[in-house]
Amino acid sequence: GNSVLSGFNVEFLAHSLNTKEDTAKRLRSPQDERGQIVKVEDGLHIISPELQEEEEQSHSQRKEEEEEEQEQRHRKHSKKEDEDEDEEEEEEREQRHRKHSEKEEEDEDEPRSYETRRKWKKHTAEKKRESHGQGEEEEELEKEEEEEEEIQRQHSKGRKNGLEETICSAKIRENIARPSRGDLYNSGAGRISTVNSLTLPILRNLRLSAEYVLLYRNGIYAPHWNINANSLLYVIRGEGRVRIVNSEGNKVFDDKVSLGQLVVVPQNFVVAQQAGNEEGFEYVVFKTNDRAAVSHVNQVFRATPGEVLANAFGLRHSQVAQIKSNGNRGPLVQPQSQ
């Protein structure tokens, strides 16, 4: 059966993974006809480090012991603390009650909201008019209402256009080509910079992100794929080769691209780029997700247990060690021939 790497030639795959060509051949076309669903004769086991299990067990035991000790200490002190707290709360309640009762006798509480204050003042003014007449009280009430409206306008002025002000003041420009801005770097291969909604929040509204890639001469951006986004590659300088393989291992694109050309890479299609011999290869990738996620083949291999790789691709342990332990630990690769 074919693997997803079947669409890449053996030489390029060996350079990308920094391994020998016979190992690359196994990865490209493993001698295995089992397909995607297999029957396990001796039972299925999950490969996991034993030390990790022991550490988790000891950690859980320590956690349980600490919780028991905390409960015991809590039970010892809770009774006394509850009694003290009850006494203090009772005293505070009595003090508050005395203060409130005295204040209520002197004056009624004034309402806080604008509408209720207005009604309250009208009610007070009506009482005054009944006993003292209407002239001076009405003028005083009108002045107070005008003052209240002015205060209300001042408070609402800052909130009226909050969303528009946020958008107008938002940062809309980011220079991801700046060398100090690089997220991934290989002194012999190049550098990669990304920008998404975490670094430029306005991209959340656009639902877009971008990736800037600069490959030095013969530098390789090893096979990788976008998990949650389609992408559009635009060349801004130099020339390089772009290889695209679909999820069935079939080659769908393998050609050189140069300044001003576009290449569309669908989601979950494996893509790899390599700069030419004469000059570097500089391009930007626009992605249809503001937090696009990328998986790299070489990092997936390094994270996969060696026994799984050996059984899946028919590799010897020495070949597995080449894949997992050799240089070029990031997605940017400098070919060994350089």
Swiss-Prot record:
Where composition is biased (Acidic residues), the residues are 82-92, 136-150
Write out the biased-composition intervals (Basic and acidic residues). 18-44
Which residue ranges does the record assign to the Cupin type-1 domain? 174-321
Q: Which domain of life is it from?
A: Eukaryota
Q: Which residues form a coiled coil?
A: none
PROSITE patterns in the record: 11S_SEED_STORAGE
Q: Which GO terms describe its molecular function?
A: nutrient reservoir activity
- Annotated region (Disordered), positions in chain: 16-162
Q: Which SMART domains does this one have?
A: Cupin_1
InterPro entries xrefs = 11S_seedstore_CS, 11S_seedstore_pln, Cupin_1, RmlC-like_jellyroll, RmlC_Cupin_sf, Seed_Storage-Functional
Statement: the UniProt record of this protein carries the keyword Disulfide bond: yes
Q: Which Pfam families match?
A: Cupin_1
Which keywords does the record carry? Disulfide bond, Seed storage protein, Storage protein
Entry-linked PANTHER family: GLYCININ G5, OS03G0336100 PROTEIN-RELATED
To which protein family does this belong? Belongs to the 11S seed storage protein (globulins) family.
Q: Could you identify this protein by its name?
A: Legumin B
Gene this protein is translated from: LEGB
